[in-house]
Swiss-Prot record:
Upper classification of the organism: Bacteria, Bacillati, Bacillota, Bacilli, Lactobacillales
An example Gene Ontology molecular-function term: ATP binding
Keywords assigned: Aminoacyl-tRNA synthetase, ATP-binding, Cytoplasm, Ligase, Nucleotide-binding, Protein biosynthesis, RNA-binding, tRNA-binding
GO cellular component labels: cytosol
Name of this protein: Alanine--tRNA ligase
Family, per entry: Belongs to the class-II aminoacyl-tRNA synthetase family.
UniProt-listed Enzyme Commission number(s): 6.1.1.7
């Protein structure tokens, strides 16, 4: 076997399959594009689903890639096992209806064993296969130097996730030798394919050849697919470990440089103490995931991807604490991650200035979060005492763990000091529920969707002419599909999919909704209503139409757009470009578009940004867009190659993929973007631009909704009506007086609130005067014990504050019946002798409650206000008992 590092192994895989006619697909963003079923890209095939389900036909049916991926559904295993990671790379080769087993297996063997490539000794390789798939077994055994007896049948070697494509798979295992054997020879798992450390799975090849139809349970009865596919996956980290003879993935060149830096920062040594090794591994794994995710545009937050990043960062910080790293340190690991991955992912080092500030901010914020977690725990302990509870609920403990990053062990220790326990059974349930939610969010990876044979096989040419004209005469009907079948004609009343040889109808794409309109005869008679237009797999525009008259293949028709809708959508699309540029100019040049929706009545624009956009900034953005509308800038476009477009300064949409030829839309000298949609001819056509709202829709992603033209005018008229109504309520003579009237109203309200507080304080003082007159004695201590009903805790505290000022006794206990609940507060002037917390604990059972606090002040709550008198009466008994100790 050759001596190869991780970069060489990755590149050799890609080079090999490129030599076999495969196109190298670049590693795509970890943030899925147009796939809401996935939280992250979680496998090599995840970015290729559009090819396998037939929604897009690839330029080359042979594809290979090295795809960065994230999976967090087993996050708790990271650091405790040899090969669990949240971030990893998958090497893969794929065939979309092209080659199959007879090519895939010999190529796999060649890559693995040929001295020109990996050069692995054949005797170290073992193969598992599906028992009924004898073809696969025979193909492996026919390879040069294949060792007899190294094929093992496995009943679970059949890939099937429900209805849709399925098929047998074959796995390649590498024998690491007796040195790594962790089970006795007679253990049922001690074989290639079992759960052991000696035989390591390094490659899985799926033969997608059957169609799992609804109602079928026996895979031997699945029918063959018309297009058979190949999907393979080789985990880079695993393969590197065998080339470097490493005990686990963490002792390879992908991880060790990070571990060495953590050693330097902590003063600890990796490999010395098992628990500390877990922390080394967690930090090393998590910083890789966080670095790549932030580089791809994800940001920490409370939901979705943002929550995952925040959780990974917090886990890394907590494990840093376990290694006695007290200061922020994670940013120092980012350049090391970038250097390790530089050969294939140069963007990490290029994006350091974007990645490091995010981690720095989040790490600093987490220190405050830890403090907040401690405060919450204090509140929970206090509440438990009030409610006479003996436990902190598992739900609350999980909130401390999940939201504040507070370890369960720390919660248990703090609770024990307060005489409480933690409901760990309920905590475990909350943890399990969250893991199930995470797995659901990841979604079942459906490698291939149903293959729509009718659409995939459609190769008829169709040209979109809508950039230059809004109607077409003598368009020919090139294809008709009814009920998923190609037909020669369709009848009135049917819903059909139509393809024309040329069309002015824009197909929904890039956030812009599709055109609508009519199919007409030469005399203007409407033959069909077009309600939607989408891109077919072979890039034709496919029109969803409700037929009013019969239509047939070859028939000549006229195509007419709904011009009111088309013009409104085009104007709003131009407005999104103006808004995009205004955001870059006013806020920051590194803002990325994160999505958009262009409708006739309004537009929606999503963009990457931390935190809300201030109102003043939104005003500047709105003013700039309206200025460019007033400037009457011409809107033009050219078609050119992608490199020329970049030289022109055209902005690409973050995460989008482009072909060799691109369309660049320019709005004067103000904005240039890659774009395939329709636009106004001049910005003056927009008339007016008005922002309706700005909001957050996820971690680090903001959304602006806006209107233009007539919609903007209507909105302003509605605002004017509301303002007039407010003026009427406030008795304002002019609309301009409304703000001053509101300020007057607020000031009046504040004055009333002050008067209420003043009266409350006076009432408390009067109550204090009365109860301070009744000082009691018990043992050697003086005390006051009184009940004042309908008081809040704050009211009771004010009485205690007044008591401290007057120093009239050694102890005070005040109780109140507030809405059927009993409240007690106690304060001690001699906390070293009479602890307020102990007094409250002693008397609170009388009100069926519990409580506690500091030696100088404590409080309790209970559900039996009828017991207040008994509780107060028992104070003397408690104080007398102190003399006897």
């Amino acid at each position: 076997m050759k001596k190869l590092n991780s970069a060489q192994i990755r590149q050799m895989f890609l080079d090999f399959f490129q030599s076999k006619g495969h196109k190298i697909e670049p590693s795509q963003s970890l943030i899925p594009q147009d796939d809401p079923s996935l939280l992250w890209i979680n496998s090599g095939v995840a970015t290729l689903k559009k090819y396998f389900d037939g929604s897009v036909i690839p330029d080359n049916p042979r594809i290979t890639n090295a795809q960065k991926s994230i999976r967090t559904n087993d996050i708790e295993n990271v650091g405790h096992t040899a090969r669990h990671h949240t971030f990893f790379e998958m090497l893969g080769n794929f065939s979309v209806g092209d080659y199959f087993k007879k090519e895939a297996i010999p190529w796999a063997w060649e890559l693995l064993t040929s001295p020109e490539w990996y050069g692995i000794e054949p005797e170290k390789l073992f193969i598992t296969y599906y028992p009924r798939d004898t073809e696969t077994k025979e193909l492996w055994e026919s390879q040069a130097d294949f060792v007899a007896g190294h094929t093992i049948p496995q009943d679970d070697n059949f890939w099937d996730i429900g209805e849709g494509p399925s098929g047998p798979d074959t796995e390649v295992f590498f024998d690491r030798g007796p040195k790594f054997q962790n089970l006795p020879d007679n253990d049922p798992e001690m074989y290639p394919g079992g759960e052991n450390e000696r035989y390591l799975e390094i490659w899985n090849i799926v033969f997608s050849q059957f169609n799992h139809l609804p109602g079928l349970t026996d895979n031997s009865k699945y029918p063959e697919l018309p297009h058979k596919n190949i999907d393979t996956g080789m985990g880079l980290e695993r393969v590197v470990s065998i080339f470097e003879n490493a005990p686990t993935n963490f002792e390879t060149d992908l991880f060790l440089p990070i571990i060495r830096k953590v050693e330097q920062l902590s003063g600890k040594r990796y490999g010395k103490i098992k628990d500390e090794d877990v922390s080394f591994k967690v930090i090393t794994d998590h910083i890789r995931a966080v670095t790549f995710a932030i580089s791809d545009g994800a940001l920490p937050g409370n939901t979705g991807r943002g929550y995952v990043i925040r959780r990974l960062l917090r886990r890394a910080v907590m494990h840093g604490r376990k290694l006695e790293i007290e200061k922020p340190f994670l940013t120092q690991l980012v350049p090391i991650v970038g250097k390790i991955m530089e050969a294939y992912y140069p963007e990490i080092l290029e994006n350091e200035d974007k990645i490091i500030p995010v981690i720095q901010s989040e790490e600093g914020r987490f220190n405050k979060t830890l403090t907040a977690g401690l405060n919450l725990l204090d509140d929970l302990i206090e509440k438990a005492h009030k409610d006479n509870a003996t436990q902190i609920s598992g739900k609350d403990a999980f909130k401390l763990f999940d939201t504040y990053g507070f370890p369960l062990e720390s919660t248990e220790e703090q609770a024990a000091d307060a005489g409480l326990t933690v409901d760990t059974t309920s905590f475990d349930k909350e943890m399990k529920d969250q893991q199930n939610r995470a797995r659901t969010a990841q979604g079942k990876l459906k490698t291939f969707g149903f293959q729509d044979e009718a659409l995939m096989s459609l190769k008829v040419p169709s040209v979109y002419v809508g950039w230059k004209q809004s109607s077409v005469d003598d368009a020919k009907i090139a294809a008709i599909i009814v009920d998923d079948q190609q037909v020669d004609d369709a009848k009135a009343g049917q819903k059909a999919l139509l393809i024309f040889d040329k069309t002015p109808f824009y197909a929904e794409m890039g956030g812009q909704v599709a055109d609508q309109g009519t199919v007409q005869a030469a005399n203007g008679k409407v033959l069909a209503q077009v309600t939607d237009v989408q891109n077919a797999p072979n890039k034709q525009h496919i029109h969803t139409a409700k037929l009013i008259s019969d239509l047939k293949i070859g028939q000549k028709v006229n195509l007419r757009l709904d011009m009111h809708r088309h013009v409104a959508v085009s104007k709003n699309h131009t407005a999104t470009h103006l808004l995009d540029q205004a955001l870059r100019n006013v806020i920051a040049g590194n803002i990325h578009q994160a999505g958009s929706l262009v409708e006739p009545d309004y537009l929606r624009f999503d963009f990457t940004h931390q935190g809300p956009v201030p109102t003043e900034t939104l005003d500047r953005i709105e003013d700039l867009v309206n200025q460019k509308i007033a400037d009457a800038l011409p809107v033009s476009w050219i078609e050119t190659d992608i490199e020329s477009a970049k030289k022109l300064g055209a902005v690409a949409v973050f995460g989008e993929k482009y072909g060799k030829k691109v369309r660049v839309v320019s709005i004067g000298d103000f904005n240039k973007e890659f774009d395939g949609g329709t636009h106004a001819k001049n910005t003056s056509e927009l008339g007016l631009f008005k922002i309706v709202s700005e909001s957050g829709i996820g971690a680090g992603t903001r959304r602006i909704e806006a209107v233009t033209g007539q919609s903007a005018f209507k909105m302003l008229k509605n605002h004017e009506k509301l303002l007039k109504k407010a003026a009427e309520f406030l008795s304002a003579q002019k609309l301009a007086d409304v703000p001053d009237k509101i300020v007057d109203l607020q000031n009046n309200l504040k004055n009333v609130q002050k008067q209420v507080e003043s009266l409350s304080d006076k009432a408390a003082n009067v109550a204090a005067d009365k109860i301070f007159e009744k000082t009691l004695e018990a043992g050697k201590y003086s005390y006051i014990a009184a009940q004042i009903d309908n008081q809040t805790v704050d009211g009771l505290r004010k009485i205690v504050d007044e008591w401290r000022q007057r120093a009239v006794s050694d102890l005070i206990i005040i109780a109140t019946n507030n809405n059927g609940k009993a409240l007690l507060v106690a304060a001690s002037a001699k906390p070293n002798e009479v602890k307020a917390g102990n007094v409250v604990k002693a008397i609170s059972p009388k009100i069926q409650g519990g409580g506690g606090g500091r030696p100088d002040f404590a409080q309790a709550g209970g559900k039996n206000p009828a017991g207040i008198a008994n509780a107060l009466a028992s104070v003397s008994e408690y104080l007398e008992s102190l003399d006897q100790r």
